[in-house]
Swiss-Prot record:
Organism listed in the record: Picrophilus torridus (strain ATCC 700027 / DSM 9790 / JCM 10055 / NBRC 100828 / KAW 2/3)
Keyword set, alphabetical order: Ribonucleoprotein, Ribosomal protein, RNA-binding, rRNA-binding
NCBIfam families named among the record's database cross-references: PRK04211.1, uS12_E_A
InterPro entries, alphabetized: NA-bd_OB-fold, Ribosomal_uS12, Ribosomal_uS12_arc, Ribosomal_uS12_euk/arc
GO BP terms, alphabetized: translation
Name of protein: Small ribosomal subunit protein uS12
Family: Belongs to the universal ribosomal protein uS12 family.
UniProt GO MF annotations: rRNA binding; structural constituent of ribosome
Record note on quaternary structure: Part of the 30S ribosomal subunit.
Record keyword Ribonucleoprotein present: yes
Superkingdom assignment: Archaea
Length: 142
């Protein structure tokens, strides 16, 4: 490594080169998160429910976490989304239009004991899933 009064350019050049070894730098500069993200960088997205699935919780927990398989409207990509709340899966039917958002795991990944699920359902046919579970609102018949 050069050091001296006139070594600035060399130092800058070598920093620029070695910075590409940093995974986070590379992902940020090349916009890799946005390119691989099914939501394409948006906070929420609409989709159509394809099927209901039960995903088994990771060790040491046991139980079946109720999730839905969704096809996004804007790009046709498929993803799994968790249905939060007691009996929430009963308010979601196939071919319903749902709104999904990130589940809130660290670094945009899955949360807790639900493997491979990075999103959660927040609305069903334009009505908040939380309100449906609480019984404050009823699901409209389309």
């Amino acid at each position: 490594m050069a050091n001296g009064l006139n070594a600035g350019k060399k130092l800058m050049k070598s920093r620029k080169t070695y910075r590409w070894s940093d995974r986070d730098y590379k992902r940020r500069v090349l916009n890799l998160k946005k390119k691989s993200d099914p939501l394409e960088g948006a906070p929420q997205a609409k989709g159509i429910v394809i099927e209901k699935v039960g995903i088994e919780a990771k060790q040491p927990n046991s139980g079946i976490r109720k999730c839905v398989k969704i096809q996004l409207i804007k790009n046709g990509r498929q993803l799994s989304a968790f249905a939060p709340g007691d009996g929430a899966i009963n308010y979601i039917d196939e071919h319903d239009e749902v709104v999904v958002e990130g589940i809130g795991g660290r670094m945009g990944r899955s949360k807790g004991d639900i493997p491979g699920v990075r999103y959660k359902v927040i609305k069903v046919n334009g009505i908040s899933l939380h309100e449906l579970v609480k019984g404050r609102k009823e699901k409209t018949v389309r």
